[in-house]
Amino acid sequence: MRAMSTNPPNLRPDLAPAARLGTAATRPGQPTIGMVSLGCPKALVDSERILTRLRAEGYGISPDYAGADAVIVNTCGFLDSAKAESLDAIGEALKENGKVIVTGCLGAEPDYIREHHPRILAVTGPHQYEQVLDAVHGAVPPDPDPFVDLLPASGVQLTPRHYSYLKISEGCNHKCKFCIIPDMRGKLASRPAHAVLREAEKLVDNGVKELLIISQDTSAYGLDRKYDTNLWKNREVRSHITDLARELGQLDAWVRLHYVYPYPHVRELIPLMADAGCNLLPYLDIPFQHAHPDTLKRMARPAAAARTLDEIAAWREICPEITLRSTFIVGYPGETEAEFQTLLDWMDEAQLDRVGCFQYENVAGARSNDLPDHVPAEVKQERWDRFMAKAQAISEAKLAARVGQVIEVIVDEVDDEAATCRTKSDAPEIDGNLFIDEGFEGLQPGDIVTVEVDEAGEYDLWGRLR
């Protein structure tokens, strides 16, 4: 067996690795800004938009604290552990640079931030781009040079050049008791279909090979707009996830859907995934969270686990190669051993391909904090261990069945030892990889190549070029 990678699925998709930006060299005297981006891909898109605006105004982007005239920290406030990470990042930026502007979800609690870090220059809430720019202008006045300061046509990206997150809406209409996202980011606000498609086309024209569609609730896209129509390429396109996915699937790039709730109309997407002429990947990221109806009711989630299994069966009948990813919470207040066992039994039936799980923790402001019968920490850990053991066994069996298959992969990274790739079943950061460790020297990030799978592990595959 080749050496196993240390790459199980990311168990905390709400806390993606921090992204720091490095870009082209700045000109002499150019004001420069550093960026630390924490949290989910939706926050990463906010960071990209802020940096794109700053580049358009003549600011340079520094990859380190020392070269920056000021630093923006885009925070996460979804969980208490995320708040602690954000406070640590702010403290590090203050220590290393001294001029710090805070934005993002934790920015919705300015008094809390200033209590811990009174030296910060300014605090703004999530997706408040204009306020961030105003704060930057006050700390570091712009000094643009129109003959030198060039902005990439696709804007500034914090991801590798070959894939990009595409945010189609803000906010959420759900009232899940464990979540404070609607309080921080507001109700659902969908972008017009033509604006999404124009951005997607520009990204693909500039070399992006994979579009990762994100929002708080992707399947609710357009609900707030009453599914209005927009003119795109001399035809009308409805602001509905099915219509949007169909149009995106005509672009020359992989299209991957994240944060899809299992509404009945999701079944309309599955034939598009099965259509060889559409680039919508057979992949659904659906946050089921639990399977026992009583637990789901306490979460204020749709309590229809039995129908969920029926939907999964229907999806697989239409598109047998579909990959299903989900995240779950164990140890939610009031969760009994019987309820947890129902979740394990549901997992046996659902046979999900990619699974992440985290133990429940209180979040300041969440209604779940006041629920009775909180689960002891040692019980939460024990249940998490049992859940992940089952998920790992399912993953290992499913990947073993892929040995001998010939599949397409996209190259993410190439070093001296191997090319790190992903299959159509794997999203960046949160899923597994396929490694090519022979004959890979000519590959470049963004290449899409054909491989034969010749070995499988618990979460990763290995293959050789065909």
Swiss-Prot record:
Q: Where does [4Fe-4S] cluster 1 bind?
A: 40, 76, 105
Instruction: Kindly report the protein's main subcellular placement as a broad class.
Output: cytoplasm
Q: In Gene Ontology terms, what is a biological process of this protein?
A: tRNA modification
User: What Gene3D superfamilies does the database record attribute to this sequence?
Assistant: Methylthiotransferase, N-terminal domain, Nucleic acid-binding proteins, tm_1862 like domain
Enzyme Commission no: 2.8.4.4
Give the residue spans that cross the bilayer: none
Reaction catalyzed? L-aspartate(89)-[ribosomal protein uS12]-hydrogen + (sulfur carrier)-SH + AH2 + 2 S-adenosyl-L-methionine = 3-methylsulfanyl-L-aspartate(89)-[ribosomal protein uS12]-hydrogen + (sulfur carrier)-H + 5'-deoxyadenosine + L-methionine + A + S-adenosyl-L-homocysteine + 2 H(+)
Q: Which InterPro entries does the UniProt record give?
A: Elp3/MiaA/NifB-like_rSAM, Methylthiotransferase, Methylthiotransferase_N, Methylthiotransferase_N_sf, NA-bd_OB-fold, Ribosomal_uS12_MeSTrfase_RimO, rSAM, rSAM_horseshoe
What GO CC terms are in its UniProt record?
cytosol
**Domain MTTase N-terminal per the UniProt entry, residue ranges:** 31-141
Name all Radical SAM core domain ranges. Answer: 158-397
| Subcellular localization(s) per the UniProt record | Cytoplasm
Q: What class of enzyme is it?
A: transferase
Q: What does the UniProt keyword field contain?
A: 4Fe-4S, Cytoplasm, Iron, Iron-sulfur, Metal-binding, S-adenosyl-L-methionine, Transferase
One Pfam family in the UniProt entry? TRAM_2
Task: Name its co-factor(s).
Answer: [4Fe-4S] cluster
| Comment on bound cofactor | Binds 2 [4Fe-4S] clusters. One cluster is coordinated with 3 cysteines and an exchangeable S-adenosyl-L-methionine.
Free-text function comment from the UniProt entry: Catalyzes the methylthiolation of an aspartic acid residue of ribosomal protein uS12.
Stored NCBIfam families:
30S ribosomal protein S12 methylthiotransferase RimO, MiaB/RimO family radical SAM methylthiotransferase
The family line of this record is: Belongs to the methylthiotransferase family. RimO subfamily.
Q: This protein is called what? A: Ribosomal protein uS12 methylthiotransferase RimO
List the source organism: Ruegeria pomeroyi (strain ATCC 700808 / DSM 15171 / DSS-3) (Silicibacter pomeroyi)
